[in-house]
Amino acid sequence: MNILQNLKDSDPVISNFINSEKNRQETHLELIASENFASIAVMQAQGSVLTNKYAEGLPQKRYYGGCEFVDEIEELAINRAKKLFNANWANVQPHSGAQANAAVFLSLLKPGDTIMGMDLSHGGHLTHGSPVNMSGKWFNAVHYGVNKETSELNFDEIREIALETKPKLIICGYSAYPRTIDFESFRNIADEVGAFLMADIAHIAGLVASKLHPNPIPYCDVVTTTTHKTLRGPRGGLILCKDAEFGKKFDKSVFPGTQGGPLEHIIAAKAVAFGEALQPDFVNYSQQVIKNAKVLASTLINRGINIVSGGTDNHIVLLDLRSINMTGKIADLLVSEVNITANKNTVPFDPESPFVTSGLRLGTAALTTRGFNENAFEEVGEIIADRLLNPNDSLIESQCKERVLSLCNSFPLYEGKLEASIK
């Protein structure tokens, strides 16, 4: 084995698969709400020699030698994260959002304690108390949902559930909720019942960082997030607190509580992404993400397709396909046939199973990174509507795919610079 070989020479099979995935990303419209395109700089950091370094512990408090440079990098990542979110404490080591949530649970809860989060079928997340997840197996999970008429949070109902169940922890922040979250109202409810309040802002972190969505830091005891999605970094997790002393308890819950060695190459990539998000043009990007989502939603509404809650305040557009007598499973297949990548998703009060669903979840973060503007997203909406409203028309299917490829050619991914960056 020669460690100096390039990937294409060392393992051509894997190299070919990576190239195939690169081609898929270039020739498809990426509308999965939890995905984005990381910068070349972020990918260079996570593909660096830092992958070789073990660094258990925290900066300046390691269990291994040779950590002087990764200490500098991790401290920079911490400081940038704190500045970005106006927090007084941060841990950048969680491998994922799920790991970040697990560390919070380990710090604040004991098995059997009651936690309260949004029902998964209403837009919650597996790690917020779903019975198939550790959070629903180890804790007594109770759930709140949205109003049946508006599909928005009903704080009177949330308060009633909290008063009745007395949760130890209340979780806000969601995977399929397109409206602004009122963190102050959650704080008031948490204080009334003596609960900790955690915000999981995995989907909206980039919008929060850009001050286009209220910041949960002033209201929540702890905030978790992923570092990809709207934040446009590497796949990873992050924990934040306004109270530095309170935050320190989560350090031990990350290591050694739920993880071993941190991934210093990913932490470097997080630092790069945080640095990018601190630049003024990232705010412009985030503003465009929201503008594009609003145009996408209104275009679909004008074509007779219902949108959950009637629109969006963030990057998520959730289609309720019952309005056109279609399931999410079928819609997902139909758009995939014309090179559009999305995902079937439950909608509030969904009569279908999670394997079928009545919804299709779309997100605008990735294509906005690619340069799509309102005009382009109006065309995206028209293509989706044409495909869904004419599922058996092969001519329209062919035309939709041609229009998708035309858009992809108009907004090239990485502008052809990716090959040069990885040689």
UniProtKB/Swiss-Prot annotation:
Q: Which cofactor does it need?
A: pyridoxal 5'-phosphate
Residues with PTM N6-(pyridoxal phosphate)lysine: K229
The molecular function terms in GO held by this entry are: glycine hydroxymethyltransferase activity; pyridoxal phosphate binding
**Binding annotation for (6S)-5,6,7,8-tetrahydrofolate:** L120, G124, H125, L126, S353, P354, F355
- Residues carrying the site annotation Plays an important role in substrate specificity: H228
Q: Name one GO biological process term.
A: tetrahydrofolate interconversion
Per the record, the pathway is: One-carbon metabolism; tetrahydrofolate interconversion; Amino-acid biosynthesis; glycine biosynthesis; glycine from L-serine: step 1/1
The EC class name is transferase
Reactions catalysed, semicolon-separated, are: (6R)-5,10-methylene-5,6,7,8-tetrahydrofolate + glycine + H2O = (6S)-5,6,7,8-tetrahydrofolate + L-serine
The record's listing under PROSITE patterns reads: SHMT
CDD domains named in the record: SHMT (cd00378)
Give the matching SUPFAM superfamilies. PLP-dependent transferases
Tell me where it mainly resides: cytoplasm
Q: Which Pfam families match?
A: SHMT
What subunit structure does UniProt give? Answer: Homodimer.
- Under what name is this protein listed? Serine hydroxymethyltransferase
